[in-house]
Amino acid sequence: MNLFIMLTMSSITVSIVVALNLLTAKTSPDPEKLSPYECGFDPLGSARLPLSIRFFMVGILFLLFDLEIAILLPLTWAIHTLNPLKTITWAIIIFLFLFIGLAYEWLQGGLEWAE
């Protein structure tokens, strides 16, 4: 019986909220809202537009540092293992490896946006 009352009250509440939204919502369609938007590219234009290598490089660097964070996040729990010195050593090696890669990319000009 309690389950039935809960389901009924939930359905009534949802119906009231949806009805109020439909009655009070202001709609103002304009060409910008009605046109599809796909990451800054015109979806009705040519699908074979060249991709900037700069965006690609920034995406790859983002993935690398995202992976670094995913690897280093469990470090706080891993320090409490039997051999914390080994854990810290591996974390420093991973961090230095990625830092050297970032420095190399920076020195090669891969992070420069201006020509």
From Swiss-Prot:
Keywords for this protein: Electron transport, Membrane, Mitochondrion, NAD, Respiratory chain, Translocase, Transmembrane, Transmembrane helix, Transport, Ubiquinone
Domain of life: Eukaryota
Assigned EC number: 7.1.1.2
Subcellular location: Mitochondrion membrane
GO cellular component: mitochondrial membrane; NADH dehydrogenase complex
GO terms, molecular function: NADH dehydrogenase (ubiquinone) activity
Membrane topology, from the record: Multi-pass membrane protein
TM spans (from-to): 3-23, 55-75, 87-107
Keyword Electron transport listed: yes
Coiled coil: none
Entry keyword annotation includes NAD: yes
Record-given protein name: NADH-ubiquinone oxidoreductase chain 3
Gene behind the chain: MT-ND3
